[in-house]
Amino acid sequence: MAEQIVVLRLGHRIPRDLRVTTHVCLTARAFGADGLILADVVDTALEKTILDVCKRFGGSFWIRMGEPWRQAVKDWKSKGGEIAHLTAYGIPLPEAMEAINASPKPKLVVVGAEKVPGEVFEAANWNVAVTNQPISEVSALAMFLDRYFEGKQFSKEFENAQLRIIPSAHGKKVVNLTEHND
């Protein structure tokens, strides 16, 4: 397993993709990714939302914006990292995961919002298909990260959290960790 896993979000269109890209970020964070690069654009509303979640619920997830995707891919590969591109046209997820998990190199997971340029398919070490059918990038990312982390994300502790959700069969329970009970 790699020491670092980062998501590269391609094709984000402001304001059209705000909700879906927010969900890509939330999924990446909750399922154990270190951070997300939002390629080619800066979306301050998205950044504010994600940083607020990180502040309240903890963790060290980061978001970087505006970097041209070609540069992000080039820099990642030049530092010895590998790229897994999530697409309907790739190798089925179960077949790809053995090789992906066996490599200790940092991983960049590419998810698109609109048609992904052919260059991404060429640059990727793995073009990974979740079902070989049209699918939401949010669900594809969740499936990929679940297989990648082999379920370990379910016991992950998020450091410096202000709030913690307590599992409950009925109702909602949230504990404010900043309040002191004397």
Label the model's feature ranges.
Residues 1-4, 30, 155-182:
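SAM-dependent methyltransferases
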Residues 46-47, 69-73, 93-94, 117-118, ...:
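Short, well-ordered alpha-helical microsegments
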Residues 89-90, 169:
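Short, flexible active-site-adjacent loop segments at beta-strand->alpha-helix junctions, enriched
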Residues 120-172:
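Structured adenosyl-cofactor binding patch, chiefly the S-adenosyl-L-methionine
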Residues 90-130:
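Long, charge-patterned amphipathic alpha-helical coiled-coil/hairpin "stalk" segments used as oligomerization
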Residues 1-88, 145, 149-154:
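RNA substrate-binding interface of SAM-dependent RNA methyltransferases
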Residues 21-23, 51-53, 97-101, 123-126, ...:
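Short, glycine/charged-enriched secondary-structure capping and boundary segments
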